[in-house]
From Swiss-Prot:
NCBIfam families in the cross-refs: gatA (TIGR00132)
GO biological process: translation
Subunit structure: Heterotrimer of A, B and C subunits.
Known function: Allows the formation of correctly charged Gln-tRNA(Gln) through the transamidation of misacylated Glu-tRNA(Gln) in organisms which lack glutaminyl-tRNA synthetase. The reaction takes place in the presence of glutamine and ATP through an activated gamma-phospho-Glu-tRNA(Gln).
Active-site annotation: 77 (charge relay system), 152 (charge relay system), 176 (acyl-ester intermediate)
Protein name, UniProt field: Glutamyl-tRNA(Gln) amidotransferase subunit A
Keywords: ATP-binding, Ligase, Nucleotide-binding, Protein biosynthesis
Family annotation (Pfam families): Amidase
Domain of life from the UniProt record: Bacteria
């Protein structure tokens, strides 16, 4: 049963072929079987999940219509609020914080009869690309337990990859959905800025953050977008981009023209380059024309991103001061000590590094030198993408410059930041982008193809991702490999 997609599970529960209670019990058994190896979750809510499943089964027995996610288990990244569960952001600062409300996306999932299984591990406050910066425990890649799952939504990607849940929610500020999706061999979608409400998401960088789904198929990503995309009066940045459903737009039609920034791809490892261009050859075989596009300005994207994201993070995290809520140092006896010790003891090293960088670039002496210049370059990146889209419908890039690396292999922060080279620009430019599994590296690890569209063209991006998935027979390719893994094998 754990190999079923969300669509298949919802259909089976709606038709009475499966019960929501049976589905929920099955996935908790799966979690109990392998979670000790993977470490995808921070907290589980088995009792509440089974109560919700029972209500769904009773609803069906009364002949009432069920929602789009009838009985579908969902994992939630632990920076998204769920009533009754702690929102820790994988930080000691919020270790005991329990929100009094649901995030809008969670509210909409519950309304469609989805079942929340628990909260998923992440890099602290979503700052990182390994999920090793969690204050609680690391998460391991289900394809190779000695390797990272990516981050910051590493728990979400690992949970979907290990089949602990068919779908999960993550957040993407600079690649935090797409990179772990590629590392763990699943589909990850970063919607356009404003396409999904951020109400109930603990902010990292408010002009960059976006909630999105991770799943084993593009169809399930489309299903989740149908459930929770759209305008929300509680989030002034949210917009109503879509008139029709995502599911109705899925087809195997290929785009007429795909743009490729070839000069930006120099230096790729041979097997990564070969996989990327062989993926594009599948589109060419179906009639797509590839054109070169000029996006050399993206070589500055990582620098610009870390200036702007850190500045916004420093501002957003200023509220965690030990006064109103969150961790309060027992050693503090004065107001000054309360601020200094609570934050110094509560935040991890990476979060403190970003806060320091953010406060530095926002200081009176440095704001013009760094922050304002970075804002100006961001505007140029937005313009460069607009120019590129005049030549093509869709852009394509790799998701990452390497497959998942070993835990402890990369320790230098700057080297880790450079892992984001192919993902941060889409956040800076507010664009939708999907990571779809595309094959395997020379080590046998998953790789991903990234498909990018114009802001508001999320449905086209998902449709092209679906087209690639079907023409490349990705589901069949990856299902053959699952059985060979200790974590991914077992009884169905």
């Amino acid at each position: 049963m754990y190999r079923y997609s969300a669509l298949e599970l919802a259909k089976a529960v709606t038709l009475g072929e499966l019960t929501a209670t049976g589905v929920t019990q099955h996935f908790f058994h799966r979690i109990e079987e392998a979670e000790g190896q993977v470490g995808a979750f921070i907290s589980l809510c088995k009792e509440q999940a089974l109560e919700q499943a029972e209500l769904i089964d009773k609803k069906r027995s009364r002949g009432e219509p069920l929602g789009k996610l009838a009985g579908v288990p969902v994992g939630i990244k632990d920076n998204i609020h769920v009533t009754g569960l702690k929102t820790t952001c994988a930080s000691r600062v919020l270790e005991n914080y329990q929100p009094p409300f649901d995030a809008t996306v969670v509210e909409r999932i519950k309304k469609e009869d989805g079942i929340i299984l628990g909260k998923l591990n992440m890099d602290e406050f979503a700052m990182g690309s390994t999920t090793l910066y969690s204050a609680f425990h690391p998460t391991h890649n289900p394809w190779d337990l000695s390797r990272v799952p990516g981050g910051s939504s590493g728990g979400s990607a690992a949970a979907v990859s290990a089949r602990f849940c068919p779908v999960a929610l993550g957040s993407d500020t600079g690649g935090s959905i797409r990179q772990p999706a590629a590392f763990c061999g699943v589909v990850g979608f970063k919607p356009s800025y404003g396409a999904v409400s951020r109400y109930g998401l603990v902010a990292f960088a408010s002009s960059l953050d976006q909630i999105g789904p991770l799943a084993n198929t593009v169809e399930d990503v489309a299903l989740m977008m149908d459930v929770f995309s759209g305008r929300d009066p509680k989030d002034a940045t949210s917009r109503e981009f879509f008139r029709d459903s995502f599911m109705s737009k899925l087809s195997t039609e290929v785009p007429k023209v795909i743009g490729v920034p070839r000069t930006f791809l120099e230096g790729l490892r041979d097997d990564i380059r070969e996989n990327f261009f062989s993926s594009l050859a599948i589109f060419e075989g179906e009639g797509t024309h590839l054109v070169d596009v000029e996006l050399d300005i993206l070589s500055h994207a990582v620098s610009i991103y870390y200036i702007l994201a850190s500045a916004e993070a420093a501002t957003n995290l200023a509220r965690f001061d030990g006064v109103r809520y969150g961790y309060r140092s027992p050693q503090a006896h004065t107001i000054s000590q309360l601020y200094d010790l609570s934050r110094g003891e509560g935040f991890g090293k990476e979060v403190m590094r970003r806060i320091l960088l953010g406060n530095y670039v926002l200081s009176a002496e440095r704001q013009n030198v760094y922050y304002k210049k970075a804002t100006a370059v961001r505007a140029k990146i937005v313009k460069a993408f607009r120019t590129a889209f005049e030549k093509c419908e869709i852009l394509a890039m790799p998701v990452c410059s390497s497959p998942a690396f070993e835990i402890g292999e990369i320790l230098d922060p700057v080297t880790l930041y450079l892992q984001d080279i192919y993902t941060v620009a889409m956040n800076l430019a507010y664009l939708p982008a999907i990571a779809v599994p595309s094959g395997f590296s020379k080590e046998g690890l998953p790789l991903g193809l990234q498909i990018i569209g114009q802001q508001g063209q999320d449905q086209q991006v998902c449709q092209v991702g679906y087209s690639f998935q079907e023409h490349a027979q990705i589901k069949q390719l990856f299902s053959k490999r699952y059985a060979k893994s200790v974590v991914l094998g077992g009884q169905s």
